[in-house]
Amino acid sequence: MIFKDYDFLQNYDLKNFGEKVKIYKELLSKFNRIHNLTHLKNIDENIFDSIKILDFYDFSKAKNIADIGSGAGFPAVFLAFLLQSNFHLFEPNPKKTAFLRTLKIECELSNLHIYKEKVQEYKNTFKADIITSRALMDIKPLLEICTNLKDENTVFILWKGSEIYQELENIKDYEIFENNLRKYCIVK
């Protein structure tokens, strides 16, 4: 994938990003052979899906970003490749956590912090400016399990599909941006 062709990425270090993406793909391939971390067929599409939010939302003021149910790193890892924010990834699966920790070392990501626990079990030491999650669970239960990480200024950015509108019942302050079948939902 040629990232320099996208206008919304023009202000980022795409050479460094490309190098880290290459490391990511090699490491994922190696881990997937043993641990079956993900069934994704088109990694490039999923990487693009992870960073497309930068076209819709300004992350520049976010100091701490929490990602819930990080799995194989979509979307948080690719945002961490581009942004200076501290990323806190919550993933209880030991195999996925091992992958993320290895990736952190291989890519020299000092802004990546990985927690092998469910977010609701975390004894917080920070409040997140942004909380991200990609298709983990419905919105309302997600908001509830993140109580210990959020305050009145926390913004949720959620990668969702076509069922999003049913999930937004009783949620008042939100925006939705669309790219193909993906719905990026920002809940304030």
UniProtKB/Swiss-Prot annotation:
It is found in: Cytoplasm. The keyword rRNA processing applies. InterPro entries: rRNA_ssu_MeTfrase_G (IPR003682), SAM-dependent_MTases_sf (IPR029063). The keyword Cytoplasm applies. It comes from the Bacteria. It catalyses: guanosine(527) in 16S rRNA + S-adenosyl-L-methionine = N(7)-methylguanosine(527) in 16S rRNA + S-adenosyl-L-homocysteine. S-adenosyl-L-methionine binds at residues 69, 74, 119-120, 134. One of its GO terms (molecular function) is rRNA (guanine-N7-)-methyltransferase activity. It is an enzyme of class 2 (transferase). Keywords: Cytoplasm, Methyltransferase, rRNA processing, S-adenosyl-L-methionine, Transferase. Its main location: cytoplasm. Its EC number is 2.1.1.170. GO terms for cellular component: cytosol. PANTHER family: S-ADENOSYL-L-METHIONINE-DEPENDENT METHYLTRANSFERASES SUPERFAMILY PROTEIN. Specifically methylates the N7 position of guanine in position 527 of 16S rRNA. NCBIfam families: rsmG_gidB. Belongs to the methyltransferase superfamily. RNA methyltransferase RsmG family. This is Ribosomal RNA small subunit methyltransferase G. It comes from Campylobacter jejuni subsp. doylei (strain ATCC BAA-1458 / RM4099 / 269.97). The gene is rsmG.
